[in-house]
């Protein structure tokens, strides 16, 4: 089977997920290629320039595919013009709401109009969260198929042996409004430990810092399914996270982690300090999280579902 994946980049977020899926499908025997298109390295022009240049690349390209799979709305334009039997669009999170939280009303309105149009271009729509699937059905009456993004546990064997740093609290993610990093920074001086931030680092470096930490904090205002939660589960690092988006699909409060409301610095501060002081609870949460990820979210568990999805689609 010949498949083309399209994403603005193939590291972090949905693009990182695309790269991981491509790698596993290639190992399985599928012929998967990644489209690489340039974009202007200017904040507000990154996506528009990617849309233009990737679409142009698709229009002039002669290669034909069984399936073209676009990851996020900006990739859908190149998907539309790629020569293929079937088209798939994956969205992690409600795209128009993400844009609305980060940009002006004009841009947000344009994103909302664009979102409703591009969804019609795909033969199949997929997402990594039950809540996103539900919200798109309610909002636009469109049907998404749902697949969790698996965790590749084999990669962790490459990490160095790291010495634990007592009472180290870590944030891993983009330095952006929706990730809530400003909320954690606001209370940093009141936390009974050291806070470290991994905001634009290589995966190995971030994971080694996570492995050394006592608690992972995910203070997001908006989320789909953060991959870092699965990574912390596997490394047996207890988690405090906001109960937004798909996070409650992974974290059961007081069982596999601690859930708190978003935008509440005081509750975040108290939750961190209480867990730093409770080693027994930390160990219980860490062990439960590990069992959850091993039993539900590895490639060994989920790869057959991905393979079946592509085979069923190309044969339909």
Annotate each predicted stretch with a short phrase.
Residues 221:
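Aromatic "clamp/platform" in nucleotide-sugar-dependent glycosyltransferases that forms part
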Residues 67-69, 82-99, 126:
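Active-site proximal beta-strand in glycosyltransferases
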Residues 146-166:
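Acidic anion/phosphate-binding donor-loop and adjacent secondary structure
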Residues 56, 106-125:
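Membrane-proximal helix-turn-helix segments that form the acceptor-binding/catalytic region
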Residues 253-254, 258-265, 274-280:
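Conserved acidic donor-binding segment of nucleotide-sugar-dependent glycosyltransferases
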Residues 238-241:
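Short hydrophobic beta-strand element within catalytic cores of glycosyltransferases
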Residues 163-179, 185-188:
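Conserved donor-binding/catalytic core segment of Leloir-type glycosyltransferases
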Residues 267, 274, 281-296, 302-308:
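A short, well-ordered alpha-helix in the C-terminal region of glycosyltransferases
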């Amino acid at each position: 089977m010949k498949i083309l994946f399209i994403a603005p980049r193939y590291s972090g977020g949905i693009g990182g997920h695309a790269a991981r899926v491509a790698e596993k499908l290639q190992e399985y025997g599928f012929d998967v290629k990644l489209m690489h298109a340039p974009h202007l390295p200017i904040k507000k022009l990154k996506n528009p320039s990617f849309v233009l240049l990737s679409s142009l690349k698709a229009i002039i390209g002669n290669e034909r595919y069984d399936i073209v799979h676009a990851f996020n709305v900006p990739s859908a334009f190149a998907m539309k013009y790629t020569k293929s039997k079937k088209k798939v669009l994956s969205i992690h999170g409600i795209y128009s709401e993400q844009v609305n939280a980060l940009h002006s009303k004009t841009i947000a309105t344009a994103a909302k109009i664009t979102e409703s149009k591009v969804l019609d271009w795909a033969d199949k729509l997929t997402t990594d969260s039950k809540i996103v699937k539900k919200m798109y059905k309610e909002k636009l009456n469109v049907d998404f198929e749902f697949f969790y993004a698996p965790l590749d546990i084999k990669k962790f064997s490459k990490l160095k042996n790291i010495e634990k740093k007592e009472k180290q609290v870590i944030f891993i993610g983009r330095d952006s409004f929706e990730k809530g990093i400003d909320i954690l920074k606001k209370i940093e001086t009141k936390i009974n430990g050291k806070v470290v931030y991994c905001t634009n680092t290589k995966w190995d470096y971030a994971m080694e810092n996570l492995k050394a930490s006592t608690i992972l904090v995910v203070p997001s205002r908006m989320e789909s399914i953060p991959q870092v939660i699965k990574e912390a589960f596997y490394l047996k690092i207890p988690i405090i996270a906001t109960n937004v988006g798909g996070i409650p699909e992974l974290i059961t409060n007081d069982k596999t982690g601690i859930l708190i409301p978003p935008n509440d610095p005081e509750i975040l501060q108290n939750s961190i300090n209480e867990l730093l002081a409770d080693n027994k609870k930390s160990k219980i949460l860490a062990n439960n999280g590990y069992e959850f990820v091993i039993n539900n979210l590895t490639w060994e568990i989920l790869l057959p579902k991905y393979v079946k999805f592509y085979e069923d689609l190309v044969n339909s």
